Amino acid sequence: MDNQKGALFPDEVILQILARLPVKSLFRFKSVCKSWYRLPSDKYFTSLFNQLSVKEQLLVAEVSDSSSLICVDNLRGVSELSLDFVRDRVRIRVSSNGLLCCSSIPEKGVYYVCNPSTREYRKLPKSRERPVTRFYPDGEATLVGLACDLSKNKFNVVLAGYHRSFGQRPDGSFICLVFDSESNKWRKFVSVLEECSFTHMSKNQVVFVNGMLHWLMSGLCYILALDVEHDVWRKISLPDEIRIGNGGGNRVYLLESDGFLSVIQLSDVWMKIWKMSEYETETWSVVDSISLRCIKGLVPGIFPICQTGEYVFLATHKQVLVYQRRSKLWKEMFSVKGSSSLPLWFSAHAFRSTIVPCN
């Protein structure tokens, strides 16, 4: 920081204040002085900023009649985010620690990783997979994952699915392509996995914790996890109450909760939040049970999108709701005006506002 006589606050206090600003405001203040201009690229400051920002979860969603995304913040309300800087028509596939992985709409097989807060992006090189080998059944990867490691300022993109050679039946091989941001290269490994199936929401809600990417299997068999450093797949058990009862007719969703793996179980009248308190032993515990009686009419079409220990964001066809866990109050944060072709929950993702380079 620039030393100035008569400064009101010590440098560290100023850094703590600046680290709590939205990224947009922080970049606006770069013109104040040289030291503030350098902050977004300063390792100490970006680490401090990211440590604070990961404690908050935002919700981003595409609105069908708008070219921008809505961004819903528990404290600051609703704002807009644009992906126009990517210079392609894209759709969000997954989110991780402030980065979004998007696929090109006009050109199949083209992927981008971008940070909408800093408006930086990287177009990923195409893998060297031969065109005679393709993902089954529709030519696209079954799973898309993004693992953003804030401690190392790096990310991995994962494309995985069953492959078949052209003109042949699938042979059961589960192919995984992993992009490494440091080497700017793809690597490939092949596993033998029993046939896995996933819902639209379980593909959207990919959770990166403990160096692993996690997807919830449809049928509530287990959670499929990938160690992105060692290229190893692992199966993680769900809570016995969910697994043995096959969900008991309830809907179950996989989320993160303050760095822990979490599942949310929805019945007609209750929302039960589970947290994996011990990862290695796969120990689950119930941390909250929330009555849904006051939003009973919305329950059949409501989906939890993201959460912290303080609140839960949920989306319906046309609304975004927040539940405050301490006060036990519900609040509508956003509502689509007029008709909407796609439901909000279909394109809603957890998001964080971080300073992570992606180019």
From Swiss-Prot:
Keywords: Ubl conjugation pathway. It comes from the Eukaryota. The keyword Thylakoid does not apply. SMART domains: FBOX. CDD domains: F-box_AtFBW1-like (cd22157). Transmembrane segments: none annotated. SUPFAM superfamilies: F-box domain. Disulfide bonds: none annotated. InterPro entries: At3g26010-like_b-prop, F-box-assoc_interact_dom, F-box-like_dom_sf, F-box_dom, SCF_F-box_component. Pfam families: b-prop_At3g26010-like, F-box. Residues 3-52 form the F-box domain. GO terms for biological process: protein ubiquitination. Pathway: Protein modification; protein ubiquitination. Part of a SCF (SKP1-cullin-F-box) protein ligase complex. Interacts with SKP1A, SKP1B, ASK11, ASK12, ASK13 and ASK14. The F-box is necessary for the interaction with ASK proteins. PANTHER family: BNACNNG10540D PROTEIN, F-BOX DOMAIN-CONTAINING PROTEIN. This is F-box protein At5g49610. It comes from Arabidopsis thaliana (Mouse-ear cress). The lineage of its organism: Eukaryota, Viridiplantae, Streptophyta, Embryophyta, Tracheophyta.
